Amino acid sequence: MTTPTAADVDRYLVDSLIGADAAPALVANAEAGLPPIDVSPPQGKLLNLLARSIGARRVLEIGTLGGYSTEWLARAVGDGGTVVTLEFEPRHAAVARENLDRAGVGDRVDIRVGAALDTLPEVAEDLGDPFDLVFIDADKVNNTNYVQWALRLTHPGSVIIVDNVVRGGAVADEQSADPNAQAGRDLVELLAAEPTLDATVIQTVGSKGWDGFAYAVVV
């Protein structure tokens, strides 16, 4: 018997626990030529479950791509809930809008186009109630900046999740020349030093390889 790979396990788990509910977005993203850097289906479902577990009604996402993770989060906030998502590339944002409207959750999602460090001040200015959950999956070198913004836009008990922190183990390599790995180390150091955050990092393995995400609670 051939030993199953991590990708095989992902396929089994998708078939058993997730199904094709949000799969059309992945297909549309591929057809539009978007880079295949969406979260995996098990990771998308995890985001959905985490948001539901804290009763999140207001979510901020930094890094939309084609809206796959956005759809999972929009399903979680329910009717009357809001996801504000920030995307640098106008074409990606347009694909995301089509995907979200097709999925029937477009009315829950506010897509802001532009560099996140430019649009975050606008989000802060427009802010009514603070966000219950922030999901960060954008340019890694700005993760510490994004977390600092997230702290301004959340409340005690809010959750901040940052994707792609482990980088195939490179986050533990002090000598790594990979700027994304160094960004991961900078993030871990910030999470350790910031008194208003209680955080951990969970390693993941699957069809997306070896990586991991930071999970922090605002205290």
Short names for language-model regions:
Residues 1-135, 140-161, 165-219:
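A short alpha-helical cap/connector motif
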